[in-house]
């Protein structure tokens, strides 16, 4: 098998979104799974729209999710001389020509064609022009598209695709200012980089016949194509920012783990048996672009949160502390190692994101200044206050290094007072945490420690 060489080639006109990241991951997996090469190319030929910040954000996103590319990043803006050489080659071989048609003439032609209910297109009037060029017109360069031919290719996702060249006009490969067009620079770079397989969004499918015309004109080897359907929202519509089409780095800020995001995106458009959870190593062992789905996939926050919760639960306390560094939460330095481990173990089971985990740390470690009203109103204060006073005395003698001892202290009150567990546990939870839900009470007592637990009960009794 020949060496697999893939690439990801974004335009730095905006931040990298999840559709682009998914395409990059597919290309990365295919190359790495076959011990091939994966390149990053920045398509920055549109100098008026380029953003250095956007280019840097693409690189930052790659670093975050762990996509390592081979060699140096290729910037198209530094390769204009190379493109000009190949444009000149086509001109010299009479495979391309200068077109002196002005914009006004082209607009008028299109209006006439529309009036005749024809498809607006250039009419090839300068294809075989041998006369004197009109003055004051900076020409564009157009490729001579072969006529009456069928361009066919077997797309790895879409299947057999055929287009008659008569449906194509002689499209522009260099603008009047000499800058090359997108379709031209793409095929030159793919050929010179030795790209064997192109995995990209199916919005590029219509470009492929034109690119094949150029591959053939320059005698370049045509790569294999895989055109992946776009990601839709849960209503089957194009993704909006509200539905997930946002900067990839926003997901890091929202508290998603890179492993979860990669797993989620790969499953949006690719499947392997009935498996849902994939480590990067498993993806490298299983991924084959032949298994890419031909139908659009739907973005689901519920699915992403489920996957992220799975990966969160499997993180060690030490790793979680590292991952939590970008987020703001209460100081943990007063906790001993056992308390810290217990805190993170308890809360990671109840959190879907790192951001949510950070908030839950605050919910436990910041003493309540007010109490959940609907729970507080249901309390029988005449019954509860003496019980909490008695339990406070029990806690002063309890061994806080042993969770079972703390649990026994709670059950002692319940048994001695002959009350239902909920009648005591609910107000105790309210006193310790300020609300009716949260982590287990023996966990809360162990994490807070004797002094803080007693203090919180005393504050509750004062209210």
UniProtKB/Swiss-Prot annotation:
ATP binds at residue 241. GO terms for molecular function: ATP binding; glutamate-tRNA ligase activity; tRNA binding; zinc ion binding. A motif ('HIGH' region) lies at residues 10-20. It catalyses: tRNA(Glu) + L-glutamate + ATP = L-glutamyl-tRNA(Glu) + AMP + diphosphate. A motif ('KMSKS' region) lies at residues 238-242. Pfam families: Anticodon_2, tRNA-synt_1c. It is an enzyme of class 6 (ligase). Its EC number is 6.1.1.17. It is found in: Cytoplasm. Coiled coil: none annotated. Keywords: Aminoacyl-tRNA synthetase, ATP-binding, Cytoplasm, Ligase, Nucleotide-binding, Protein biosynthesis. One of its GO terms (cellular component) is cytosol. GO terms for biological process: glutamyl-tRNA aminoacylation. Belongs to the class-I aminoacyl-tRNA synthetase family. Glutamate--tRNA ligase type 1 subfamily. Monomer. Catalyzes the attachment of glutamate to tRNA(Glu) in a two-step reaction: glutamate is first activated by ATP to form Glu-AMP and then transferred to the acceptor end of tRNA(Glu). This is Glutamate--tRNA ligase 1. The lineage of its organism: Bacteria, Pseudomonadati, Campylobacterota, Epsilonproteobacteria, Campylobacterales. The gene is gltX1.
